Swiss-Prot record:
GO MF: 4 iron, 4 sulfur cluster binding; ATP binding; metal ion binding; oxidoreductase activity, acting on iron-sulfur proteins as donors; oxidoreductase activity, acting on the CH-CH group of donors, iron-sulfur protein as acceptor
Keywords (A to Z) from UniProt: 4Fe-4S, ATP-binding, Bacteriochlorophyll biosynthesis, Chlorophyll biosynthesis, Iron, Iron-sulfur, Metal-binding, Nucleotide-binding, Oxidoreductase, Photosynthesis
Keyword Kinase annotated: no
Function description: Component of the dark-operative protochlorophyllide reductase (DPOR) that uses Mg-ATP and reduced ferredoxin to reduce ring D of protochlorophyllide (Pchlide) to form chlorophyllide a (Chlide). This reaction is light-independent. The NB-protein (BchN-BchB) is the catalytic component of the complex.
Co-factor: note: Binds 1 [4Fe-4S] cluster per heterodimer. The cluster is bound at the heterodimer interface by residues from both subunits.
Lineage of origin: Bacteria, Pseudomonadati, Pseudomonadota, Alphaproteobacteria, Rhodobacterales
Listed name of the protein: Light-independent protochlorophyllide reductase subunit N
Binding site for [4Fe-4S] cluster: 29, 54, 115
Cofactors, names only: [4Fe-4S] cluster
Pathway assigned to this chain's UniProt record: Porphyrin-containing compound metabolism; bacteriochlorophyll biosynthesis (light-independent)
Gene encoding the protein: bchN
Subunit structure, as described in the record: Protochlorophyllide reductase is composed of three subunits; BchL, BchN and BchB. Forms a heterotetramer of two BchB and two BchN subunits.
Reactions the enzyme catalyzes: chlorophyllide a + oxidized 2[4Fe-4S]-[ferredoxin] + 2 ADP + 2 phosphate = protochlorophyllide a + reduced 2[4Fe-4S]-[ferredoxin] + 2 ATP + 2 H2O
SUPFAM superfamilies reported in the protein's UniProt record: Helical backbone' metal receptor
A GO biological process held by the record: photosynthesis, dark reaction
Length: 428
C-alpha cells in the first residue's frame, strides 16, 4: 500500500552538525508545565517549594485565583528559610499535613523544586520518601525539579513523568503506552483511531487518576506524543519498555507516519490502515491546504523554546511550503527526533541551547518572513518590523493529530496575514 505522501528529501538533517549555543537564555522555567499537568491529573496536587515569584508565575499563567483552590500551590520559602534560620523540612512536613487534611481527595502529591529550593540545597527527594512513608498508601509523594537553573519550559512535564515511571506497577502484558499529556479531546481522538485499527489495550501516561496508572514491563511498547520527553523515554527504557520511533503527530503526514509505525508494530493490515485513516487524512490535508495558503514560499526562523521546533519545522516545510532558515531548540535528542530530522531537508542551521544576542543577530541578518520565539522576544522583534509567533501558543493550543492539523497551520498563517493587512493599511 502506498501512503500517498511526498517522498523524503534526498538528504535530511539527522546527520547535520549542530551549532551548540551556551549563553544568555530567555525562556520560561519548568514550573510552567504544572499549568497543563494539574488539569490532566485529576487527583494530583503540585506543591511548589519556592518563592512568591513562583506563586505569581503560576497564578498568572493559569489564570486561576487561589481562592478557587486549584490543584497547585506554593510553599513559600521565607527569608529565615533561605538564611538557614529555620528547619525547612519540618515546616514542609507541617504544610503537607495541613494540605492533605484539608484536601482528602489528593492521591498524588508532587513536591516541585524551584530556583530558591535548589539554591539552599533542600533535599526534596528525601522529603518525598519521608512523606510517602508517613501518608501512604493513600497518598504517594513524588518530587521533581521545575527550577529555571535546571529546566526550561517543557522540561517540567518530562521531569514529572520521569519521577512517576519507577513507581509504575510491573506487568508482562503486551500493551501500548501513549506517553505525554494531551488535552482530553485530542487524547480521545488518538485512542479512537488506534482502537479502530484493532490496537489495544491502549494506556496513557499521565493517567487521569492514580488508580488508572499503567503497568510497564518487557512487553510494553510506547509511543511519545511530545518531543520533549527525553528523561521519561530513558526511564521507561530502563524498565524494559521499547520505544516506537516515528515522526511526531503534527499535521497530516506526521500523524499518518506516527500511526503507521504503531500499526506495523501490531501487525495491522494495509487495508485496515487505509480504511481507518483515509477520511481523517483527507480532512486534515484539505484543512492544512486552506490554512497554509499564505505560508507557501515564505521563510521561518525558530528560536529555541519548547523542543517542538524540529517537528514543527518538518510540518511547515513539508506540508505548508515554507523554507526553514534556522531551527533552534533547547535540547536536541536525536534518538527521539531522528525520524522528523530525516524528513527535514538539509539546509537550515540546527542549533541547540541559547545565546540570545547571537541568535538575534542571525535573525536580523536572515530577515525571515516569520520568527517563532518566546514571549519576551516577540514584542522587541515586532518593533523592528519582524513578524513573530509566540512559541508558547504551540504548547497550550491543541495541535496534535488529524483534526487539529488545520488549526496548527492557522497558528502560523495568522501572524503572516496580520502583517500583510497592516502593510496594506499603512500604504493606504
Amino acid at each position: 500500500m502506498s501512503l500517498d505522501l511526498p517522498p523524503p528529501p534526498a538528504r535530511g538533517c539527522r546527520s547535520t552538525e549542530v551549532l551548540k549555543e551556551r549563553g544568555q537564555r530567555e525562556v520560561f522555567c519548568g514550573l510552567t508545565g504544572i499549568i497543563w499537568l494539574h488539569r490532566k491529573m485529576q487527583d494530583a496536587f503540585f506543591l511548589v517549594v519556592g518563592s512568591r515569584t513562583c506563586a505569581h508565575l503560576l497564578q498568572s499563567a493559569a489564570g486561576v485565583m487561589i481562592f478557587a483552590e486549584p490543584r497547585f500551590g506554593t510553599a513559600v520559602l521565607e527569608e529565615k528559610d533561605l538564611a538557614g534560620l529555620a528547619d525547612a523540612n519540618a515546616e514542609l512536613d507541617r504544610e503537607v499535613d495541613r494540605l492533605l487534611a484539608r484536601r482528602p481527595d489528593i492521591r498524588q502529591l508532587f513536591l516541585v523544586g524551584s530556583c530558591p529550593s535548589e539554591v539552599i540545597k533542600l533535599d526534596l527527594h528525601r522529603a518525598a520518601e519521608r512523606l510517602s512513608a508517613h501518608h501512604g498508601p493513600a497518598v504517594r509523594v513524588y518530587n521533581f525539579s521545575g527550577s529555571g537553573i535546571e529546566t526550561t519550559f517543557t522540561q517540567g512535564e518530562d521531569a514529572c513523568l520521569a519521577s512517576i515511571v519507577p513507581t509504575l506497577p510491573a506487568t508482562e502484558a503486551r500493551e501500548l503506552l501513549l506517553v505525554g499529556a494531551l488535552p482530553d479531546v485530542v487524547e480521545d481522538q488518538a485512542v479512537s483511531l488506534l482502537t479502530q485499527l484493532g490496537i489495544g489495550p491502549v494506556r496513557c501516561l499521565p493517567a487521569h487518576h492514580a488508580a488508572e496508572a499503567p503497568g510497564v514491563g518487557p512487553n510494553t511498547v510506547f509511543a511519545l506524543v511530545q518531543p520533549f520527553l527525553g528523561d521519561t523515554h530513558g526511564a521507561l527504557t530502563r524498565r524494559g519498555a521499547r520505544h516506537i520511533a516515528a515522526p511526531f503527530p503534527f499535521g497530516e503526514e506526521g500523524t499518518t507516519l506516527w500511526l503507521k509505525a504503531i500499526a506495523d508494530e501490531f501487525g495491522v493490515s494495509a487495508e485496515t490502515f487505509e480504511a481507518v485513516t483515509a477520511a481523517p487524512r483527507a480532512r486534515a490535508r484539505k484543512a492544512v491546504a486552506a490554512a497554509s495558503e499564505g505560508l507557501r514560499g515564505k521563510s521561518v526562523f525558530f528560536l529555541p523554546d519548547s523542543q517542538l521546533e524540529p517537528s514543527l519545522a518538518r510540518f511547515l516545510t513539508r506540508e505548508c511550503g515554507m523554507s526553514a532558515v534556522e531551527v533552534g531548540t533547547p535540547f536536541l535528542h536525536r534518538g527521539i527526533l531522528g525520524p522528523d530530522l530525516d524528513l527535514l531537508a538539509e539546509g537550515p542551521v540546527l542549533s541547540e541551547g541559547q545565546d540570545v544576542e547571537r541568535q538575534l543577530d542571525r535573525v536580523r541578518a536572515a530577515r525571515p518572513d516569520l520568527t517563532v520565539c518566546g514571549l519576551g522576544l516577540a514584542n522587541p522583534l515586532e518593533a523592528e518590523g519582524f513578524t513573530t509567533k509566540w512559541a508558547i501558543e504551540l504548547v497550550f493550543t491543541p495541535v496534535h493529530f488529524y483534526e487539529q492539523a488545520g488549526d496548527l497551520a492557522g497558528l502560523f498563517s495568522r501572524p503572516v496575514r496580520r502583517r500583510a493587512i497592516l502593510r496594506r493599511e499603512a500604504a493606504e
